[in-house]
Amino acid sequence: TIVANIEGSLLDSYGYVKDDFLIVDVVGIIYKLYNSIGMKVPTVSELREMVKCDELTWKMYELGATCSLNQCEKATTTKRVMKYKPKEIKELAAFIAGIRPGFKSLIDGFLNRLEYTNGEKAIDELLQDCFHYMLYQEAVMKIFSWLGIPMKDSYDTIKKISKKKLKGEALKKVEDTLKEHWVNNIGNLDNFEPVYKVIKDSARYSFNAPHALAMANDSLYEAWMKAHYTSKFYEVTLNHYQEKGDKNKVFALIKEVTSIFGFRMGTYEYGKDNSKFTIDDNTKTIYPV
């Protein structure tokens, strides 16, 4: 076996696939949460059934109870998810993809659930599964494929745009090629420019669909626990972030659980375990460390 340390862009130039090893904190939290109630972490299929039409879980997003919910806890994102009020996994995945920078010009209409069109009926029909928006890289590839551009060329073009490698003549060549295929399929260039702008923006910053869906699942694993086992959720997460020394997250969790769920902070008491956070369900009291 040969092990080599090679910079990512060099690997790309040789056509190799690189592996990224990431430590994802949310996975550990999810395990702790379900373990705390004696439940094995549900499979994704099981999770889908658990949250399907489950008003309590989806209410967490509507209320803005998003602290520690993956991808939704920044103040600006919380306001946005409260406005959008996702009610199914498909919508939450779309929301997570939609808050990327490349979707900035379209985000307001999306959050307000306004009917959207690309201006071309054929393109809209292609993108029915993502509300007619180019939310994902796959949506752009689907358009390229429909225009008759080979899949390999589609992938390479999106990759180069995303890494800002296409400039000047190279970028113009891509644009001219797209125009040619557009005219062949649609017959005119009336709506080419606005669609092409969205394609460029989307290719630069958009997620692929499985990435957005995986993040939505992570978020929902936590949202379900917060909705159905509220005290356990906060007990586990408060202790998790206390152990990590993340005082800001501890403060945010306490602020949320007291303001939204009506819990209160207790005081140090004899006979209580003061080495960690504990929550008394009967009195809705959080005993501090």
Predicted features by range, described:
Residues 1-289:
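Noncatalytic, beta-rich nucleic-acid-contacting surfaces in large DNA/RNA-processing enzymes
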